[in-house]
């Protein structure tokens, strides 16, 4: 009610200006008529101001609520998006029929360059389905009765899905007969269950961790039963395919020198360092780096341990001789590059199981980390200057 008070003050200040007060004092008879008119006019203005202020407040309260989007509104937005995409493709000289979302993002970044750090604050042009949240259709009729019998559970889609899955489990347990003692195991390699966020997006409902875990347990129980094609298709709705990483490691072939000694060569990289390693099948554990013993080349103990770790992991200490050449980078990066090169060369003298153990231990995986560049206006890559008020 602060706004009406300010407005009332303005009205009263206009009525009691010095000129008005002087005229009223000269003509006392005019005071009565003026007072009646002033009361009537002022009451009207005050009531009007108060009424207007209350209505504005109510409108602001309603505007702050979550907005609901109808199907007609979404269709209109999609039509406008398609028209805008066609215009944007013509501006960029591209074919509108093959103008994908990646092309739209690239065109927007080119036409509207922005230096804002927050990407969500930059200009964008996305499909309405990605901007406006999904909403359910009307869940009750004109008489106010809900359509679904599980409406008052608060999670009708989730409990309806659980009801369907449990019905399939009961039906399969009823008809499997003599197969009750044996549980079928299916190969699910190459796919995964939906995560909780994906399931919530599918059901358009918020789920707890217990609800999600119970749903996954019920689906896993369904998979242990002898399922038909219909059940298999039903379960696949809640699985997503994943890219299978090849477990086969490229192994360098064994070579032989003039004396008939078997050896293997390989390369490794770490940051800007590049290393080549030659690992001999038999030896006494000598390691030379650029013609120098590794104890002299690497004075830091941590770098020496990096070089010895592949042999220590395979229990092959003092069984191989190694000759390495390395260039670029610092001592830590060179040690990492040599370790990767030696681990790859060792694969030629070990079994497939040992190669798999090395892969799982990370010995055959290159380290992609590099030094992060310094940012302008900062002391370093992440560190900021000390803030001073003046």
Curated annotation (Swiss-Prot):
Complex formation: Component of the mitochondrial ribosome small subunit (28S) which comprises a 12S rRNA and about 30 distinct proteins.
Compartment(s): Mitochondrion
Organism: Mus musculus
GO molecular function, one term: structural constituent of ribosome
Ribosomal protein as UniProt keyword: yes
Coiled-coil segments: none
Disulfide bonds: none
Protein name per Swiss-Prot or TrEMBL: Small ribosomal subunit protein uS9m
Organism ancestry: Eukaryota, Metazoa, Chordata, Craniata, Vertebrata
Listed NCBIfam families: PRK00132.1 (NF001099)
Family: Belongs to the universal ribosomal protein uS9 family.
Positions of region (Disordered): 368-390
Gene expressing this chain: Mrps9
GO process terms (BP): mitochondrial translation
Keyword Zinc-finger belongs to the record: no
